[in-house]
Amino acid sequence: MKKWIGFAALAFVTLAQASPELGKLHYLTEEYKPYNFSNESGAPTGLAVELLQQVWQKTNTPQQPITIMPWARGYYLLTQKPNVVLFSTARTEARDPLFKWACPIGYAEIVLMGLTKSPVNIAKLEDAEKYNIGAVRADVGEQLLLNNGFDEQKIMTANRLPQALKMLTSGRVDLISTNKTTMLDLIASQQLDPAQFKVFWMLSSEQFCFAFSHPVSDELVKEFQSGLTQVLASSEFQQIQAKYFPAR
């Protein structure tokens, strides 16, 4: 687990102008490129991280520590602690009432991906139940499978996506349930041939958001959402988006 302080706050921001309540929250994330990940020096970066830093500026909040940890740990803390913000969190129907939300960071296609040479054949979702499927523990990929009635005994979980990818390439699982964009980015970063991988089924299309512990006040979430909305409409966000999604 690594904790790093974000970029310095703007010099003109004073304590009187600051948003002390947003500064009392604990900001958690995972390795999930290109939305949030560690750079070469180990500091958090990515589209969602830079978006969050811009929100802090808009709300006159001093830059806060961001803690990177395995997703399952962050998700557990989100459910147990009163002052956690976890990102980038897919806002599914099952999760929606559990937390409070500021959206969107972006949108994701959650898919079942396997090896192109695999004999996997899926004509309907139920066909996938006979295969061994890998997923990141407590990630939306795992939760969507469970919500659709898949046998948890046939879902092999990993702490991080690179571990799940290794399970796929070594033949331990037939498919991975994950975010298509993040998976393709990981494949490229490991210098694997993307032609060797194939999407066999799309499970869902979901918003990525900042999820707040339920005890966080509605007013505070509203303040954060207002800052987020301003950033999303700004030229700064267009530059951030072009940096991490250059093809868009």
Report each predicted region and the residues it spans.
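A ligand-binding cleft/hinge motif common to bilobed small-molecule-binding domains
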Residues: 76, 88-98, 174-195, 200-204
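Ligand-binding clefts/hinges and TM-proximal coupling segments of bilobed small-molecule sensing domains
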Residues: 62-65, 140-156, 195-196, 228-248
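N-terminal signal peptide c-region/cleavage motif recognized by signal peptidases
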Residues: 13-18
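Periplasmic-binding protein-like
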Residues: 29-31, 108-111, 189-225, 247-248
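Extracytoplasmic small-molecule ligand-binding "clamshell" domains
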Residues: 19-97
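Short helices/loops that flank or line small-molecule/ion binding pockets
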Residues: 67-68, 72-84, 100, 127, ...
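Flexible hinge/capping segments at coil-to-helix
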Residues: 114-133
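Extended ligand-binding regions for polar small-molecule ligands
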Residues: 46-59, 139, 210-240
